[in-house]
């Protein structure tokens, strides 16, 4: 008997309060690594009405004007009018940054393996910046090997921001959220149940002053300018039963940091797989590559995507775990949920052979320290909104499938 169910994922725009914080945090990462690629950074940001607080720990040779950096990013996002409750030029920016704890630094600078004379391998030099568990996922639901619900939700959010920025829908304001419920039948996406868009907007639109008229105009415009263009090249289309909800509270004029406080690292499911895969709990933004919450999660995605791209599984989840100050992973797990084409133990052996999963190895393989300088001073801030994975609009090293053929070759050698 077939099983029919719904799965829902959400996304938020770059103007969402939490995403403002993520982007400022990662702009700090970009700037510090651009000037000093050995920078150690844990940058947290809080925003509220008229206020930005930058706090955390930074050890770097770079000299950065954090106040100016934050204002520029806020303006780029679109908060330039104080009448909207938050503006780049008028908000207060407070900076309270300390140096990285020497107790933590010693374990990162010289890993347990070298301190105990267990190894002289260069890649054993850097210890994990913290303990923790990280997950990565890939599946064959979309060309970018991402789950369809989060893929569509991000596309709607990016399109929503685009029509605001181009002026096509000039009455839109920066804050917004999207949500998509996909119909599955026996694990395969077959339809769209609900599309939800909540978007901040002007009080009136042209000559339309009553709220009912404003909401009707927004709903019609979003269907034509956001939903239809996104779905144009998607195989699954809305049906007559598909619900399209816009601003279900009835109004969304007060938004951004005036409507809700924002904090770095509060959109970890939006950043990853939309709840479709497990999550270790660690956020990405504001962390330099020695923090395995970030770098190892990227490595997990890299491994999982190459396994699926190689045709070795239809779905794959990879888990890594680390101990603070220790270079080598505590554990590595490869799970294919019954869709694997080869023995999972042999697949795990191939992963261990082909992928370097020590922090220094991940940093080196994915070039995580040099990316900001190679990309003109901005890299991490661009993945801080609209997802860190499955980004066809960005050239992300962990999205490469260069190991797929090598995985198949390695498994052929052992007779799989």
From Swiss-Prot:
Entry protein name: S-adenosylmethionine synthase
GO MF terms, alphabetically ordered: ATP binding; magnesium ion binding; methionine adenosyltransferase activity
GO biological process: one-carbon metabolic process; S-adenosylmethionine biosynthetic process
Description of how the protein assembles with itself and partners: Homotetramer; dimer of dimers.
Family indicated by similarity: Belongs to the AdoMet synthase family.
Record: residues binding ATP: 16, 175-177, 251-252, 260, 266-267, 283, 287
Keywords, in A-Z order: ATP-binding, Cytoplasm, Magnesium, Metal-binding, Nucleotide-binding, One-carbon metabolism, Potassium, Transferase
Record organism: Crocosphaera subtropica (strain ATCC 51142 / BH68) (Cyanothece sp. (strain ATCC 51142))
Pathway: Amino-acid biosynthesis; S-adenosyl-L-methionine biosynthesis; S-adenosyl-L-methionine from L-methionine: step 1/1
Reactions this protein catalyses: L-methionine + ATP + H2O = S-adenosyl-L-methionine + phosphate + diphosphate
InterPro entries: ADOMET_SYNTHASE_CS, S-AdoMet_synt_C, S-AdoMet_synt_central, S-AdoMet_synt_N, S-AdoMet_synthetase, S-AdoMet_synthetase_sfam
EC number(s) given by UniProt: 2.5.1.6
Family matches, as PANTHER family: S-ADENOSYLMETHIONINE SYNTHETASE
Binding positions (Mg(2+)): 18
Names of required cofactors: Mg(2+); K(+)
Cofactor note: Binds 2 divalent ions per subunit. Binds 1 potassium ion per subunit.
Described purpose of this protein according to its UniProt entry: Catalyzes the formation of S-adenosylmethionine (AdoMet) from methionine and ATP. The overall synthetic reaction is composed of two sequential steps, AdoMet formation and the subsequent tripolyphosphate hydrolysis which occurs prior to release of AdoMet from the enzyme.
NCBIfam families referenced in this protein's UniProt entry, alphabetically: metK
Annotated segments matching region Flexible loop: 100-110
Positions annotated to bind L-methionine: 57, 100, 260, 291
GO CC annotations on file: cytoplasm
Binding site for K(+): 44
Superkingdom, natural source: Bacteria
Compartments, record wording: Cytoplasm
């Amino acid at each position: 008997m077939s099983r029919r169910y719904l799965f829902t994922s959400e996304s938020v725009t770059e103007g969402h309060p939490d995403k403002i914080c993520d982007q400022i945090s990662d702009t700090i990462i970009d700037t510090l690594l651009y000037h000093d690629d050995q920078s150690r950074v844990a940058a947290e940001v809080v925003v509220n009405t008229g206020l930005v607080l930058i706090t955390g720990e930074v050890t770097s040779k770079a000299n950065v004007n954090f106040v100016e950096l934050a204002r520029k990013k806020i303006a780029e996002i679109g908060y330039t009018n104080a009448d909207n409750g938050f503006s780049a030029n008028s908000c207060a920016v407070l900076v309270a940054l300390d140096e990285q704890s020497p107790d933590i630094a010693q374990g990162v600078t010289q890993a347990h393996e070298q301190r105990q004379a267990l190894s002289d391998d260069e890649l054993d030099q850097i210890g994990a910046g913290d303990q923790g568990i990280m997950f990565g996922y890939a599946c064959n639901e979309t060309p970018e090997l991402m789950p369809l619900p989060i893929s569509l939700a991000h596309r709607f959010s990016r399109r929503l921001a685009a029509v605001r920025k181009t002026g096509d829908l000039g009455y839109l304001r920066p804050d917004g959220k999207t949500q998509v419920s996909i119909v599955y039948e026996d694990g395969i996406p077959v339809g769209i149940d609900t599309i939800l868009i909540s978007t901040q907007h002007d009080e009136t639109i042209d000559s339309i002053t009553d709220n009912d008229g404003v909401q009707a105009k927004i709903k019609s415009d979003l269907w034509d300018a956001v939903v239809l263009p996104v779905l144009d090249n998607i195989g699954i289309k809305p049906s007559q039963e598909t619900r399209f909800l816009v601003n279900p509270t009835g109004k969304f004029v007060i938004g951004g940091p005036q409507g809700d406080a924002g904090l770095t690292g509060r959109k970890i499911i939006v950043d990853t797989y939309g709840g479709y895969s497990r999550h270790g709990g660690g956020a990405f933004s504001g962390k330099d590559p020695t923090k395995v919450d970030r770098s190892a999660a990227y490595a997990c995605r890299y491994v999982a995507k190459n396994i699926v791209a190689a045709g070795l599984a239809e779905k794959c989840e990879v888990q890594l775990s680390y101990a603070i100050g220790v270079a080598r992973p505590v554990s590595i797990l490869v799970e294919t949920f019954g869709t694997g084409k080869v023995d999972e133990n042999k697949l795990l052996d191939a992963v261990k052979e082909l992928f370097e999963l020590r922090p220094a190895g991940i940093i080196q393989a994915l070039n995580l320290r040099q990316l900001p300088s190679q990309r003109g001073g901005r890299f991490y801030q661009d993945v801080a909104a609209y997802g860190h994975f499955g980004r066809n609009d960005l050239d992300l090293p962990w999205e490469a499938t260069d190991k797929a053929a090598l995985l198949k070759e390695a498994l052929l050698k052992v007779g799989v």
